[in-house]
Amino acid sequence: SVFITTNLLSQSKLALIVAVGEYPATSKIKPIASVNDVKYIKTALGRNGFEQKNIDTLINSKATKKAIINSLTQLSEKAKKNDIVVIHFSCHGQQIRDQKTIELGKDEDDGYDEAFLPYDAMPKYSPTGYKGENHLRDDDLYPHLLNIRKKLGSEGSLLVLLDACHSGTGTRDESFAVTRGEPIPFANPENPMDSIINLSAAEAKQGFFEAAADSLSNMVVI
């Protein structure tokens, strides 16, 4: 009884919310309702005992790749045994040519990494400019998530919500819906690859459309 009480008192509930719905005009990335997701997620977290001071939010221009990585690092440093951690990403998703990493090597059968588009990412490859350095790859996330998971131990919990996808069969009328994701993979056109896989709240081959005012997936989650 004493052990259980002590265990619960020492448990913290930590969260990181990343939402990018408005990108720089120069990127020509379509706006989406990601920022509206934040209020739903924060409300749900509050109902489950998360204190506002323990919920870190990165919205639009604040959600650069560097800022996201820094927040993940800080979250990893704060997390301890038995804690509960929730990480939510709501933004555009896109595939990008697989790159070899020390941890994973070449890990994608189709030759593409799944990636999120932070605020400072661009959707198209340029041989003289942007080459994908600000895309947030699954390989970028993996070491942070693995480290957090290890620190939480067997009694802790890590929940990761990934709300991004590519175009496909819509679940709503396209006249008032927009896709959450870039349908064209990010790659050097001199070495194209044709496979497309969703990084999404949907199945790998499902399209995901959101109503103009709010995200669909988080309304289901809540």
Role assignments for model-derived ranges:
Residues 39-54:
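Signal peptide-proximal N-terminal region
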Residues 10-12, 67-90, 95-177:
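Caspase-like (clan CD) cysteine peptidase catalytic core
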